[in-house]
Amino acid sequence: TNYGGYKGKIRVIDALSTAAFDYPRRRTFFKKQLEEFFLLSREENFDVMRIRGSYAGAMGFAQFMPDNYRKLALDFDEDGKKDILNNAADAIGSVANFLASDAGNKRGWEEDGFIALPAKAKKKNVKIKSSFGLKPYNKLDIFYNQTDFDFPKQYIQISLFPDDETKDEFWIGDKNLYAITRYNPSSKYAMSVFLLSEELKITSDL
């Protein structure tokens, strides 16, 4: 959404009803979302004809589908409304709630867990495919550990991202990285968010 600058221009009711009745492959999913949208609109006093979002019916800063809006959106600033459409504070709190929930990860976000660690292959030109989102990759003995963190002993989700320039620099991601991808299923998105968060820590003294 370009940090909330573009949240979509399609009426959510149009997007969901079109997909629910004219898209057989995902009909069950979108019929459920249409029902959730009507329930959400009643609960939050929305005008169903005015709410706009993405082509798939996702809404607001966080681009939540209606079911996740109902289950996971928070009134983070405690003003009496769960507003991820226009309220950045509510949106940020709601995304954090998503990551900590079963939707984000079967075990939820681990507050003290790492997201991704830099690692260097012990041999040059090592051929390793990214294991992102697939089976845990447990051959970590081929890497040098370049951080103060220990590589995890039990792998929930391990992802390897070769550096495009050096080819022998890797990032090893654990289940917190995987949780980010449950919000957006792009490995590049997840790594971008992680690296941006690290820069924010530096500049804001977090």
Locate each region found by the language model.
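Short, functionally critical alpha-helical segments immediately adjacent to catalytic or ligand/cofactor-binding
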Residues: 1-4, 37-42, 95-97
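Secretory-pathway/luminal and periplasmic proteins that interact with or process carbohydrate-rich
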Residues: 1-11, 21-27, 43-49, 63, ...
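Second-shell loop/turn segments in exported
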Residues: 2, 18-28, 51-58, 77-86, ...
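Extracytoplasmic/secreted proteins, especially bacterial periplasmic and envelope-associated proteins
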Residues: 11, 15, 29-36, 60, ...
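Flexible, glycine-rich surface segments
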Residues: 48, 55-165
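C-terminal functional modules
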Residues: 146, 153-206
